[in-house]
């Protein structure tokens, strides 16, 4: 219905996909993203201009990646980490949105897929270590091999909240990196500590105030 309406109005389309999106990818998540890309290419090309953005992890103050792991790391003294050598090139949300805005009238980006990454490559373990450093806490991180990572996914998938699923595990079998496309300039280590540490410090301060009976 949306594509039909875009055809009628000839709206400029900016579609958010994912790095490694492919109908033949190992995970259903990446397959669905790939199918969506194909649908846009097959149905919009003749009617309006589109750009498909394919980012790695997108991070920022309210992100679901660093904030989720910071919450888990505060709770768990021992943290078994699946697929610790999987690679990512996280891109800062401000860099990505500015690039998307610049592309709206840029004809060189019309009807193209564009990978969008940050300037540096990190392993999953490095990102977890950076999260710990940002929170100024220490935890025992246990890197899991392929077999144990898959087992963890199967167990966690049946638990409430589904913190880690088999489909997540399959997605992690492909490194979320790219040597082409747009590269943001913001480094994870320069941005993430600002909001993780500030958030943690504020909540810790509020707890101390409550314990002391102060409002």
Question: Which residues make up each language-model segment?
Answer:
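Mid/C-terminal beta-alpha module of Rossmann-like enzyme folds, strongest
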Residues: 103-163, 175-215
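A short C-terminal helix-loop "cap" of Rossmann-like NAD(P)-dependent dehydrogenase/epimerase domains
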Residues: 69-83
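Substrate-positioning beta->alpha
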Residues: 64-65, 83-105, 112
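Conserved beta-loop-beta element that borders a ligand/cofactor-binding pocket
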Residues: 38-62, 71
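SDR active-site strand-loop-helix element
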Residues: 13-19, 53-55
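Single conserved hydrophobic/aromatic residue that forms the stacking wall/gate
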Residues: 1-11
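Short-chain dehydrogenase/reductase
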Residues: 1, 26-37, 59, 63, ...
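Conserved active-site helix of classical SDR/Rossmann-fold NAD(P)-dependent CH-OH oxidoreductases
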Residues: 34-41, 98
């Amino acid at each position: 219905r949306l594509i039909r309406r875009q055809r009628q109005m000839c709206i400029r389309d900016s579609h958010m996909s994912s790095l490694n999106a492919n109908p033949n990818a190992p995970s259903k998540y990446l397959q669905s993203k790939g199918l969506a890309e194909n649908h846009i290419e097959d149905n919009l090309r003749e009617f309006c201009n589109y750009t498909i953005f394919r980012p790695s992890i997108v991070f920022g103050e309210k992100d679901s990646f660093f904030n989720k792991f910071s919450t888990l790391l505060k709770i768990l003294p021992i943290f078994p980490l699946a697929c610790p050598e999987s690679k990512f090139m996280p891109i800062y949300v401000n860099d990505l949105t500015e690039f998307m805005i610049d592309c709206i009238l840029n004809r060189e980006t019309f009807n193209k897929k564009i990978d969008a990454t940050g300037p540096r490559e990190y392993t999953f373990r490095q990102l977890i270590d950076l999260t710990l450093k940002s929170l100024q806490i220490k935890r025992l991180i246990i890197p899991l091999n392929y077999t144990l990572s898959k087992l963890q996914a199967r167990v966690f998938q049946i638990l409430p909240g589904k913190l880690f699923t088999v489909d997540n595990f399959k997605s992690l079998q492909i490194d979320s990196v790219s040597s082409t496309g747009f590269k943001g300039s913001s480094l994870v280590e320069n941005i993430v500590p600002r909001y993780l540490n500030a958030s943690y410090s504020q909540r810790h301060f509020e707890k101390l105030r409550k314990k002391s009976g102060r409002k």
